A protein has these predicted regions:
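Accessory interaction regions appended to the cores of large information-processing enzymes
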Residues: 1-175
Length: 175
């Protein structure tokens, strides 16, 4: 799908189960658009504990290759220790790259410089299994990017609207 068609589209995705589960929010943008400026702003404005990175892969830092479309990853929670930081930027970083590349391989989005992907990522501080975390990040990102690009199934949207008075959330215990 061309960058012009996806600018400003959002989605979320979840992969796996706690504590190694990964939750992401995704924003797709077109280079040069107002939404693209938001992605660039997120990338160029780090703060203590929150370091935006450009998704890159390779066996070592000297051989990094940028994932296309360019993908900015921002952590939603500050790393609590070196282990958590390695999981966020290593295992999740590889999973994000794989998930984006899965959606490119399916033909859903283009691997170009005009499409931009912003991934806001959450990982439980108790996570510990890097292989599982990587797989869960891949699942979450692939689902979110695909949903952002093509939208939700109309029947699923209608189901939510019909159930609007009884929808639940795991962090809400009320009626």
């Amino acid at each position: 799908m061309a960058a012009e068609d996806i600018d400003g589209r959002f989605a979320q995705g979840w992969g796996g189960a706690a504590p190694n589960g990964v939750h992401v929010n995704v924003l797709l943008a077109r280079r040069g658009s107002a939404t693209g400026a938001v992605v660039a702003g997120a990338f160029t404005n780090p703060s203590a504990g929150f370091t935006p990175v450009l998704a890159s892969v390779g066996p070592d830092q000297q051989s990094y290759e940028t994932v296309h479309p360019p993908t900015v990853v921002v952590n939603k929670i500050a790393p609590v220790d070196e282990r958590h930081e390695k999981l966020i930027f290593g295992a999740c970083g590889a999973g994000v790259a794989r998930g984006v590349l899965d959606v490119v391989a399916s033909g859903t989005i283009d691997a170009d410089q005009d499409t931009l992907v912003l991934v806001s990522l959450w990982l439980d501080t108790a996570a510990e299994d890097e292989t599982t975390v990587c797989a869960n990040a891949r699942t979450a990102v692939a689902a979110a990017v695909a949903e952002a690009a093509v939208g939700r199934d109309r029947a699923a949207v209608e189901r939510l609207v019909a159930a609007r008075d009884t929808v639940r959330h795991p962090f809400y215990d009320g009626a």
